[in-house]
Amino acid sequence: GQGVGVILRDNGKQLIILTEKNVVDKADKLSVTFVNDMMADAAMVKYDSNTGIAIISVDKSLLDDATIGAIAVAELGNSNIVSRGASVIALEANYAILTGLVTSTTNELSAQDNNYSVITTDIASNKLQSGILINTDGQVIGLSLQDFNPAEENNTLTAVSISDLSPVIEKLESGADVPYIGITCTTVTEKIANRYNIPKGVYIKQVTMDSPAFVSGLQSGDVIVAVNNTEVS
């Protein structure tokens, strides 16, 4: 298969590239096609099954001078300051370049152990295509991934906040495992706590079978109020 890739880092010897797990984890061989159509072999660094993102690397010794001169390291923007009505550009894996406006930044995607902010746009998009969302400064603000996207009734592009994904990306880039608990949860705010007479904290909506949370006895409906005697806020 094929998916979008973003060059995160150039450490002098390798290019570190962010891509999708579903197009690399079962591949016998990995290759990257750069902007000038040059192809080079790549190696897996690490992936996260929960979010579906992966980090791969390409040895710069495999690239010619023209390719090195044509590529650039992406700058990750702050998706927390993206507002409704902002102009954005979508780059999809099929080389399509699409423009549009942000229509919402208030939606969330619930995943195991975390909730991720979603940027919704008015850009028409094929849900089978992955891509990246950038602002008018050329900064990456969101990722549109095949296996990690909210189910929308319309066919407009949605992207998961790059700021929310950054902690996962940093761990994968260093080759570290992403901690895994195995719960789908939501925050119990003070307003919700007062309305339903439950404590503030993290409300567990679902526990994955045989996960660390399941083994420890956590159940759907529980509210986590503290971890290691530290209050959850």
Predicted feature descriptions by range:
Residues 1-16, 38-41, 75, 130-131, ...:
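A conserved glycine-rich beta-strand in the N-terminal activation segment of trypsin-fold
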Residues 3-4, 73-79, 118-136, 205-215:
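Gly/Ser-rich catalytic serine loop of serine hydrolases
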Residues 10-54, 58-61, 70:
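Catalytic-histidine neighborhood of serine endopeptidases
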Residues 15-20, 81-93, 130-151, 159, ...:
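Active-site-proximal beta-strands of protease catalytic cores
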Residues 49-51, 62-68, 104-119, 171-178, ...:
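Gly/Ser-enriched beta-turn/beta-hairpin loop segments
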Residues 74-114, 149-152, 169-172:
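Flexible, gly/ser-rich surface segments that form the specificity/activation loops bordering the active-site cleft
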Residues 140-196:
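C-terminal cap/linker of serine protease catalytic domains
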Residues 171-226, 230-233:
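PDZ/PDZ-like groove recognition
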